[in-house]
C-alpha cells in the first residue's frame, strides 16, 4: 500500500509509533490476509510489525520477537534496550528466553554504543534496540537498519509456517500489556544533568 513515492506523505506520517500509520498497516495486513505487515520510518532505520490478526508488534513486543529469533544462536547473551521498556520484557528475555536484559539510557546511539562496548569486553550482545523500533544487530555490524530486522522477521514467518506455526508463537509467553503510557516531565533548571542524578 502507498507505494508511489511522495515526500509530502499524503496518506499518513511514516512513523511506526504513529497511531494512524499503525492503523493503516493493520488494515492492510488483515484485509489482504497477509502473514505479516511491516512498517518503516522515512529512512528505514526504525520498523514495526503487525500480525495476521491485526495485532501490533511494537515497543516491548518487537524487541521480544527479535530477541526470540536471535536466542537460539546467542544463548545467555545480553540484549540492550532503552530505559522505557517494561518489566514484562525483562521477564520474557530472562525467564522465558534465558537471556540477560540491560535496560540502558535512551537514544539509539547510546544503546548501540553500549552494545558494542559490551561485545568488545567479551559480553555477547547481539541486539541493541529501542522501543521506537530503532534496532541494530551484531550480525549487521550494528547498523541501525530496519530493513535488516524486517528480513529477520520474514525469515521467521517462513520457518514458522514450515513447522505449522505462526510467527506470534515466538512471543506467546510475553505477558499481556496491562497499560502503556509515556510521560515527559519538564525540567526547568539549567543544569539538567546533575538534576537527573539526584
What are these regions, as identified by a protein language model?
Residues 55-74, 146-154:
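Gly/Ser/Thr-rich active-site loops/lids in small-molecule metabolic enzymes
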Residues 1-2, 56-61, 98-106:
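Short hydrophobic/aromatic-enriched beta-strand-loop microsegments
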Residues 22, 26, 38, 43, ...:
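Buried hydrophobic positions in well-ordered alpha/beta secondary-structure cores of metabolic enzymes
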Residues 45-64, 89-90:
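Short Gly/Thr/Asp-enriched flexible loops that form oxyanion-binding sites at enzyme active sites
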Residues 36-37, 42-53, 115-120, 124-129:
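Self-splicing inteins and homing endonuclease
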Residues 74-198:
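Phosphate-binding and adjacent anionic-ligand microenvironments
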Residues 7-13, 67-70, 111-116:
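Short, charged, surface-exposed secondary-structure boundary motifs
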Residues 1-49:
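N-terminal small/polar loop signature for handling phosphorylated ligands or for N-terminal nucleophile
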Amino acid at each position: 500500500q502507498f507505494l508511489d513515492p511522495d515526500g509530502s506523505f499524503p496518506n499518513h506520517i511514516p512513523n511506526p509509533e504513529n497511531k494512524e500509520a499503525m492503523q493503516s498497516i493493520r488494515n492492510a495486513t488483515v484485509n489482504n490476509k497477509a502473514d505479516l505487515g511491516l512498517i518503516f520510518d522515512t529512512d528505514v532505520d526504525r520498523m514495526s510489525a503487525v500480525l495476521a490478526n491485526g495485532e501490533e508488534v511494537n515497543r516491548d513486543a518487537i524487541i521480544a520477537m527479535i530477541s526470540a529469533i536471535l536466542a537460539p544462536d546467542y544463548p545467555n547473551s545480553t540484549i540492550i534496550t532503552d530505559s522505557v521498556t517494561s518489566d514484562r520484557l525483562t521477564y520474557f528475555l530472562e525467564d522465558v528466553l534465558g537471556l540477560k536484559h540491560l535496560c540502558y539510557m535512551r537514544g539509539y546511539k547510546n544503546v548501540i554504543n553500549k552494545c558494542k562496548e559490551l561485545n568488545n569486553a567479551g559480553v555477547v550482545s547481539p541486539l541493541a534496540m529501542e522501543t521506537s523500533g530503532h534496532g541494530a544487530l551484531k550480525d549487521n555490524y550494528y547498523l541501525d537498519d530496519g530493513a535488516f530486522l524486517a528480513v529477520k522477521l520474514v525469515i521467521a514467518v517462513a520457518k514458522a509456517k514450515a513447522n505449522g506455526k505462526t510467527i506470534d508463537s515466538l512471543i506467546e509467553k510475553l505477558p499481556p500489556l496491562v497499560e502503556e503510557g509515556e510521560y515527559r516531565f519538564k525540567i526547568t533548571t539549567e543544569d539538567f544533568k546533575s538534576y537527573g542524578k539526584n
